[in-house]
Amino acid sequence: RFIYKKLDFTVNEDGVAFKNTSMVLPGESIKKHLYKCDSAICMAVTISEGIDRQLRVLQLTDMAKALVFDSLASVAVEQACDKVEELLREEYPDYYQTFRFGIGYGDLPISMQEPFLKVLDAGKKIGLNLNKSYMLAPVKSVTAVIGLTKEPVSTKNRGCATCNLNKTCAYR
């Protein structure tokens, strides 16, 4: 299941402000990601609550199977995101797309999941919600921003090497 919205935005000192919403995504990373973009796609994808239930059962009965199942479910949600990107290329053929920039990437706080899901009405439309730690439920879900631009986009600017936090990241 998925949902997306094409939104216009402005960039200011606070971050990226999406028009006709109250959402402002803070940080330099998202500003850099949407540099020279005309608009953005805010998207959310989830594969199923049933996956979460089955994973919990396997974690209690067979951890090896749980590990494999978890990995396969991660691949499945990423493939679902790829399909949404294909759909977007068909719907907006005159635009180049940036890569998927997930909520929580770079210096964009994970707490932005809450306003992001509200803008999409994701809870009601695809059953995607948050826990108190801003983790998505169902777990095998993705939220992301894709920029749309008339100019070709480099896909090289991905990963730790280009992240604003690459010198101070606790995960490196």
Question: Model-predicted segments: where are they?
Answer:
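Arginine residue identity/basic-tract feature
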Residues: 1, 53-56, 89, 100, ...
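Active-site helix-to-loop segments that bind/position phosphate- or nucleotide-bearing substrates
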Residues: 1-65, 69
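Generic structural signal of hydrophobic/aromatic residues within well-ordered alpha-helices
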Residues: 30, 51-55, 88, 113-116, ...
